[in-house]
């Protein structure tokens, strides 16, 4: 595929994979410990404020892992190593994200809903988002909005497309990498009913990051996608 020439030598794929796994594992340990401290299990009844603390801790682990990789195995500049740049044209990604949520994802689930009507219902597909919204009120609604619309898109694009995909593209076939990272992105969310939609969305943001050579477009697309999904259940 045609994509921009890298001005910085990408981080070695093996290093990126190890850094990804180590940071992800650290995030899980932190999450479990914090949930235990708050006396929570991480289920649907977990308060938004607790969820916010746990998520921020996990994201801290992700970003710390990326910083360590960049410092010891890259240029020392995360901006250059992970393509953390946003240009005005990247704002088009907001529209792409909205279309992905309203059109593309619906198309993905049409045949699935026809084949398994009791499984792939609108109620089931929106359950996770609705449970989050139902738990929020007042100030925690603002917290939820910030986490879903800004926190998750920025950190996830940094971690999946910046750290992992960017390094793998320098060594392996573009198509294989885009598909593989999108599949990993979907599976790690641990919500099987959402796997098809998350996988297709992963392909969209993966292509955006690869074709532009930076994370701005994929981050904006992710923001537009999450914002639309949240507004649909408010």
Language-model features: locations:
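N-terminal start-of-chain detector that recognizes signal peptides
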Residues: 39-42, 52-55, 120-125, 156-157, ...
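Juxtamembrane helix-loop-helix connectors linking adjacent transmembrane helices
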Residues: 39-50, 76-152, 170
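Residue-level signature of transmembrane alpha-helical entry/exit and packing/kink sites
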Residues: 12-20, 46-55, 89-94, 140-145, ...
């Amino acid at each position: 595929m045609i994509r921009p020439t890298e001005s910085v030598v990408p981080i070695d794929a093996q290093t990126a994979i190890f850094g990804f796994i180590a940071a992800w594992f650290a995030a899980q340990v932190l999450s479990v410990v914090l949930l235990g401290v708050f006396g929570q299990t991480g289920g649907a009844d977990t308060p938004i404020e607790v969820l916010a603390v746990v998520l921020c801790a996990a994201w801290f682990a992700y970003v710390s892992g990326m910083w360590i990789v960049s410092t010891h195995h890259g240029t020392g500049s995360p901006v250059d190593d992970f393509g953390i740049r946003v240009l005005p044209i990247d704002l088009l990604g907001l529209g792409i994200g909205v279309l992905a949520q309203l059109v593309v994802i619906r198309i993905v689930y049409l045949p699935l809903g026809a084949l398994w009507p009791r499984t792939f219902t609108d109620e089931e597909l929106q359950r996770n988002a609705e449970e989050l919204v139902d738990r929020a009120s007042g100030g925690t609604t603002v917290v939820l909005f910030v986490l879903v619309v800004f926190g998750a898109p920025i950190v996830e694009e940094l971690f999946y497309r910046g750290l992992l995909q960017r390094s793998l593209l320098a060594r392996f076939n573009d198509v294989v990498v885009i598909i593989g990272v999108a599949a990993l992105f979907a599976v790690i969310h641990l919500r099987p009913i959402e796997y098809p939609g998350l996988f297709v969305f992963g392909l969209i943001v993966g292509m955006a990051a690869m074709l532009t050579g930076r994370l701005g477009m994929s981050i904006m697309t992710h923001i537009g996608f999450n914002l639309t999904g949240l507004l649909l259940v408010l």
